[in-house]
Amino acid sequence: MDQLRLEPVSRVNGVVNIPGSKSISNRALLLATLASGETTLVNLLDSDDIRHMLNALKSLGVNFTLSDDKTVCTLNGLGGPIQTDKAFELFLGNAGTAMRPLCAALTLGTGEFTLTGEPRMEERPIGDLVDALRQLGADIRYLKNDGFPPLTINATGLAGGVVEIDGSLSSQFLTALLMVAPLAKGAVTIAVKGELVSKPYIDITLDLMAKFGVTVVNDNYQRFEIASGQHYVSPGKVLVEGDASSASYFLAAGAIGGGEVKVTGVGRLAVQGDVKFADALAAMGADIEWGEDYIIARGSKLHGIDMDMNHIPDAAMTIATAALFAEGTTRMSNIYNWRIKETDRLAAMATELRKVGAKVEEGHDYIQITPPVKPVHAEIDTYNDHRMAMCFSLLAFADCGVTINDPGCTSKTFPDYFNRFANLAKPD
């Protein structure tokens, strides 16, 4: 197993241009495919998850070109659903942002499609989405366990109608439904049951759908109405914002490390909800400065907070490790959906924080962290989860440093993360 030892770092300083957002990249690729016209995506994320989406689209006959650095993609839209008389098997790794939207989109046209993934993907629920698609007339069957991939779709189109979906588990299910609804044969009304998690991710979806010319009536995130007869039309060019979740590690480093870190590519005007991570850091005592397309974090004495993190579920993980450098206890609540991500992030985070000496209380949907007087060096298991690896890089600010097991798992969203981190760090 590969390991990376991060030696103690006293402070950080510098500027980081954040790679494109994973959430926006994969949504935009799918909408560009369904749209009429040619779309150029600029600042596309080059990572495993995006590669899985691109490979699937290529297999399905979608034509696109990539720049040498794979951050600019020009794609010729199909002007509607994918229509084929062939059977396809598509391997989607552990990319939820490819599995869920593709599962929905492939029901719109014709063909037989089998969607598979890594073993962890077979543990990530998709049943709520499949149930909703079946309400609209989709023919989908599970190949192993009910409610989980792999699955096979026999596509004949979606009829339209009223559909209910549980919003309390993952916003990706609602995102997938919203993106396909305009291309159903009839009008679609989506009623959301339960409290909608990760609401800002729905804002990303609605923003992109509007850019591609589709109208959605949003009734307070509890009911969405999508008229029939709509079509996606390419806006020509889509600029992908920097990934706000990826920005969180560098902002936390600035807050902990006593220097100044500026992240560019994401700022006050960002559509991503995870930019509000900077507000959580400010609540801990960090000095935060906002620009339209940048955020600056400066070091300060941090203190624990008690906060509902439902609105920033991915970036909230970074608060868990930043809490090791804060005075007092930090409690984060309303984060049950950590449990159905790349790994059970609540259990994994609790386990690894205890290794470095923290006192941790893990609940059904919360975590409470009391930092040790002095963290101890530990080998951190990353569970093939990119965010675990990046979060625990912050332990480099402890006198003991840290060892990250399987650091290459950051390839899911940020392949050169540790190089970027090292460029900011000033060793002791």
UniProtKB/Swiss-Prot annotation:
Catalytic activity: 3-phosphoshikimate + phosphoenolpyruvate = 5-O-(1-carboxyvinyl)-3-phosphoshikimate + phosphate
Full protein name: 3-phosphoshikimate 1-carboxyvinyltransferase
EC top class named in words: transferase
Coiled-coil segments on the chain, per record: none
Annotated GO biological process: amino acid biosynthetic process; aromatic amino acid family biosynthetic process; chorismate biosynthetic process
InterPro entries per the UniProt record, alphabetical: Enolpyruvate_Tfrase_dom, Enolpyruvate_Tfrase_sf, EPSP_synthase, EPSP_synthase_CS, RNA3'P_cycl/enolpyr_Trfase_a/b
EC number: 2.5.1.19
Subunit structure: Monomer.
Cellular component aspect of the GO annotation: cytoplasm
Binding site for phosphoenolpyruvate: 22, 96, 124, 172, 345, 387, 412
Function: Catalyzes the transfer of the enolpyruvyl moiety of phosphoenolpyruvate (PEP) to the 5-hydroxyl of shikimate-3-phosphate (S3P) to produce enolpyruvyl shikimate-3-phosphate and inorganic phosphate.
Keywords: Amino-acid biosynthesis, Aromatic amino acid biosynthesis, Cytoplasm, Transferase
Annotated binding of 3-phosphoshikimate, by residue: 22-23, 27, 170-172, 198, 314, 337, 341
Pathways involved: Metabolic intermediate biosynthesis; chorismate biosynthesis; chorismate from D-erythrose 4-phosphate and phosphoenolpyruvate: step 6/7
Sequence similarity: Belongs to the EPSP synthase family.
Chief place where the protein resides: cytoplasm
Active site, UniProt feature: 314 (proton acceptor)
An example Gene Ontology molecular-function term: 3-phosphoshikimate 1-carboxyvinyltransferase activity
Places the protein is found: Cytoplasm
